[in-house]
């Protein structure tokens, strides 16, 4: 009889332990790769995509870079015009973008009209300039404001971009500016590092942006107009943009993705064969191809320091507004310090002690680790 009681007690204890374990640690892997963990009875936490991300090395004959696992890498252009886009197939706004050089950003609309007139009269060599976008006030900001136009233009005019899709930065709006430390600063016009918002296919994104706009010089071209029997000319010259870099994410999630994207971008390394081929094909006066890695490393260092010194009140306000719009409140784990978004009312029904409401505004400047719910 005693042995039966002991066996029953053992079975009951084992069942209790299994039940306890199931309630406090059950993990489910979701279709998107994130994990949902049950931390307490009735409490579930689903990690963010940024928290769940794993990385892997991507390598070609031209370059190598560490990327978030599962992201898609596309390339276009040749030599100094080479571009790389690394994007999340589930959310293309989550993206890393590099373009070594953008060319033919016309000085004025008068110059564009002159090139168009020249082209219409049969000068097929004028086609590139006749279709080029205009950058009237040269600066990093204004370059990105016309970047969508540039992407459409160069894709149409340069077959080396065939099959490549440039990101779109429509409605580009600067929210914060930082001083540039690039080695092109003495040549560049209106150069800054920018934090900005934008839209792509109607969806709002946010990110950090850099580019060095350099003047190639004026070029007198006939406007086709006669004044006193003298043919008039206009400025048909253009600007170029070097070291065009952007890291972006869906607005209000960039705070979660920034460190992931920056750390990945820091690993970009162009091969010696690519640099040598670019050197041979280029005749650059202010941005020698051999400086590619140096220029890029400077940009990434500047991104990191700029993000650390950003105006965090902007994040606090934006994150609070996003929570109010989407119906969230924030709580934090008193044991780990991790921060979570919870649907409104979570703290009304949660009677435990581990998760407490966020009362420190500085917590809104930190990335959340996931979403918490009480069942």
Regions found by a protein language model. Give the residues of each.
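Bacterial N-terminal signal peptides that target proteins for export
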Residues: 1-11
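N-terminal low-complexity, Pro/Thr/Ser-rich intrinsically disordered segments
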Residues: 30-57
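Proline-anchored loop/turn motifs at beta-strand termini and strand-loop-strand connectors
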Residues: 60-78, 265-272
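C-terminal motif of bacterial Sec signal peptides marking the signal peptidase cleavage site
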Residues: 19-22
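Pro/Ala/Gly-rich low-complexity, hydrophilic intrinsically disordered segments
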Residues: 267-325
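Bacterial signal peptide processing site
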Residues: 24-26
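Surface-exposed amphipathic alpha-helical segments
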Residues: 71, 243-287, 371-372
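Conserved polar/disulfide-associated segments of primarily extracytoplasmic proteins
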Residues: 30-32, 74-244, 249, 297-301, ...
């Amino acid at each position: 009889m005693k042995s039966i009681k002991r066996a029953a007690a053992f079975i009951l204890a084992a069942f209790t332990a299994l039940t306890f374990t199931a309630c406090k640690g059950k993990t489910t892997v979701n279709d998107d790769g994130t994990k949902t963990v049950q931390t307490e009875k009735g409490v579930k936490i689903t990690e963010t995509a940024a928290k769940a991300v794993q990385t892997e090395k991507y390598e070609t004959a031209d370059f190598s870079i560490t990327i978030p696992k599962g992201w898609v890498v596309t390339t276009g252009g040749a030599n100094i015009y080479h571009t790389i886009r690394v994007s999340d197939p589930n959310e293309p706004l989550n993206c890393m973008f590099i373009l070594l050089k953008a060319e033919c950003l016309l000085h004025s609309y008068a110059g564009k009209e002159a090139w168009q007139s020249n082209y219409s009269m049969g000068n097929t060599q004028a086609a590139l300039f006749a279709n080029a976008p205009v950058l009237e006030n040269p600066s990093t900001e204004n370059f990105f404001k016309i970047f969508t136009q540039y992407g459409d233009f160069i894709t149409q005019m340069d077959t080396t971009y065939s099959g490549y899709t440039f990101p779109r930065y429509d409605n580009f709006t600067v929210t914060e500016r930082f001083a540039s430390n690039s080695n092109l600063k003495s040549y560049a016009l209106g150069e800054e590092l920018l934090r900005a918002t934008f839209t792509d296919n109607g969806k709002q994104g946010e990110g950090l942006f850099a580019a060095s706009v350099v003047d190639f010089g004026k070029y007198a071209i006939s406007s086709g107009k006669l004044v006193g029997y003298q043919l008039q000319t206009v400025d048909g010259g253009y600007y170029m943009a070097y070291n065009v870099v952007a890291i972006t994410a869906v607005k209000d999630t960039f705070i979660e993705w920034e460190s992931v994207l920056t750390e990945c971008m820091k690993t970009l390394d162009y091969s010696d064969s690519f640099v040598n081929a670019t050197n041979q094909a280029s005749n650059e006066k202010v941005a020698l191809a051999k400086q590619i890695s140096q220029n890029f490393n400077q940009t990434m260092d500047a991104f990191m320091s700029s993000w650390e010194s950003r105006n965090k009140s902007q994040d606090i306000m934006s994150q609070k507004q996003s929570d109010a719009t989407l119906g969230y409140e924030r709580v934090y784990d008193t044991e780990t310090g991790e921060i979570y978004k919870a649907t409104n009312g979570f703290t009304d029904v949660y009677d435990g002690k581990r998760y407490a409401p966020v009362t420190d505004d500085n917590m809104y400047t930190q990335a959340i680790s996931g979403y918490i719910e009480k069942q």
